[in-house]
C-alpha cells in the first residue's frame, strides 16, 4: 500500500512538471506536435528551442563570449544561408521546419517534414516565437 501511494505521488509530480513545461510552449507548438521532440530549455529528440534561437540570432557573431556549440551551429547556418541563397536565418529556419531534414545540429535525429500538415502561417509564427527567445 505504501509503495502505491509513493508511486502515485511521484507520478503526480511528473505530470505537474511536464504540464508546467508544456504551458510555456505556444498553443501552436502543442497543437502541431512540436512538443514531442522539442522543449524550450532542454534537448529532447531535437535541439532545445532556446539553443536554436541563440544560434540563429548569432549568425555572423564572433568572439569568446559565444557558447562554442552555439558558435559552431551559427557558423554552419551562415554557410547554409550562402549555399542556399537565403537572405536571413529566419527564411532558412522556416524552410527547415517546413521541409524537415538534418544538417544544422549535431547528433540529432532528422526533423520530419511538417508542410503541408502544418500551415505555413503556423510555421512562420512558431519560427518567430523561437527566434524571439534570444534576441541579439
Predicted regions and their residues:
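Sec/Tat signal peptide C-region and signal peptidase I cleavage site
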Residues: 15-22
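Axial heme c-ligation environment in periplasmic c-type cytochrome domains
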Residues: 36, 42-56, 68-124
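Bacterial N-terminal signal peptides that target proteins for export
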Residues: 1-8
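Sequence/structural segment immediately N-terminal to covalent heme-attachment motifs in c-type
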Residues: 23-40, 55
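Short, solvent-exposed mixed-charge patches
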Residues: 135-136
Amino acid at each position: 500500500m505504501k509503495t502505491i501511494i509513493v508511486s502515485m505521488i511521484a507520478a503526480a509530480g511528473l505530470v505537474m512538471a511536464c504540464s508546467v513545461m508544456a504551458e510555456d510552449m505556444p498553443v501552436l507548438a502543442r497543437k502541431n506536435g512540436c512538443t514531442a521532440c522539442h522543449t524550450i530549455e532542454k534537448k529532447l529528440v531535437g535541439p532545445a528551442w532556446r539553443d536554436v534561437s541563440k544560434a540563429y540570432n548569432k549568425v555572423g557573431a564572433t568572439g569568446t563570449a559565444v557558447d562554442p556549440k552555439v558558435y559552431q551551429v551559427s557558423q554552419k547556418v551562415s554557410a547554409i544561408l550562402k549555399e542556399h541563397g537565403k537572405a536571413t536565418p529566419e527564411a532558412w529556419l522556416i524552410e527547415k521546419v517546413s521541409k524537415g531534414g538534418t544538417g544544422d545540429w549535431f547528433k540529432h535525429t532528422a526533423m520530419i517534414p511538417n508542410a503541408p500538415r502544418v500551415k505555413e502561417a503556423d510555421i512562420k509564427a512558431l519560427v518567430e516565437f523561437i527566434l524571439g527567445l534570444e534576441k541579439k
